[in-house]
Amino acid sequence: MKIQRTFDNGFGRFLITLISMVFTVMSISASSTFEKPDFAYPRDVIRDADAALAQAVKAGDAPVQLLALMQKTKAAESIDADSLKTSIAEVLRYGARLKTPDAKAMFNLYAAELYNKYRMDYRWNMSGRTLPEGPRPADIAEWDRDAFTQVVDSLLAEAWEVADDTSLEQWSKAVKADRLTRTYYPAVCDFVASKILEGDLIHSPSLTTKVREQVLAKHPEGSAPWMT
């Protein structure tokens, strides 16, 4: 009996230690914060991003608003693959409230990237689809390729129209602005132009031509820093 009690006590201590270790690991893993989001816990990320978003709206901090929406979009997709439609609508809604040119440009650019991502993710669903003449369906899942091209083109054109010489470093909370980035994309207008001319986002060739001509006119030496 004494041997049995000794075994039981030892095993009990082992279990307590094991349980403590499990809770410690869970606690460390779940320490997601807005500053350091852990996307393994998407609901925590969304919770923290929502709180930061509300505060940023009150403070008029557009870069933090964009960062919060970017985090929410990524986290929501890991929970529901079809959440991108909701994320796009949310980005457009918050972007419509902004007043400064640089904020409007950055939000339009991000919205364009999300539309482009949705088209790429669901391109097989729209293969061979052609919408009739008239207004586009409210549900983007019913759009064809041309509808996405038109919307992305419009958003990029608006972004370029309002993009100004605001330092990109002011958007470092949402856009990585290291030394290399600051050298090649010193201003918001440079960043927006580069995204349009890189060709990763679907849009009309005429927009590419327009932006390139205006960039070259602004830089008589022949190129912007990021075009070298």
Task: Give each language-model segment a name.
Residues R13-S27:
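Bacterial N-terminal signal peptides
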